[in-house]
Amino acid sequence: MKKLFREIAISVFLFFGILFATLQVDWLKVLHLTPTIIGDKLSELVWDFISSGLYEVDSEKVCLPIDTLVHEMCIANGIDTASVSIVVARTYEVNAFATVGNHLVVNTGLISEMDNETQLSAALGHEMAHIQLGHIQKSIRQNAALQAILILVTGNSRSNNIRKITEKLISSGITRAKEREADESGARYIDAMHLDAKEMAIMFEKFKDDNSLSYFKDHDNNQKRAAHIREMHFTSKEPYRQILSPETWEAMQEVCR
């Protein structure tokens, strides 16, 4: 029995030792791969992995308003509309996230919690900024070995837990400095849309004490984020735009609730 435990302990030690050593190697240099090659290939695998666990919403009452807000954001900020792919996922989890392949996933749970189109645009703008600033691709490169190992080990597994681990691996490369950078860029995006960028601060303050909500739990202190946004200078003044009609907004909210 002792021999068996010793063999198991040695095997576990060797496994994690090899895994740790693997993560210390810059495989891009060793294998003479460019970031584009490894990023594109791994992105395809990871997105297939993540998207398989999403229940995608196809209701026009939801998708069209979201597409409209993103389109207006892109036009106002000189962003190629083809550079981002929007996916609306049916789940009560209050969350939105940018992920591989320039995909931006927004949950119906987040949409239903927003007070108005500007707050929703602020959440979309923050995630759009992660994509435009290259944060996601950098994170993919940093965790390439571990993500590849996870996919190989789990094979065709499509469990929700494995999907969440994969998402966490991507978000783990997003530092607080990058989060602040995304906040700032996201606020400027909605300011350029002639929306009230201070609504981003109001959104943070609204959820400052609710750590159960995934979107706000995974980010930096919301009170500090709100204060930082309020300190920023914005050019748009009242009266602000209204992009979606009240009827369109309410219809979208009704489907998402």
Model-found features: residue ranges?
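A Zn2+-metalloprotease active-site environment signal
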Residues: M1-R257
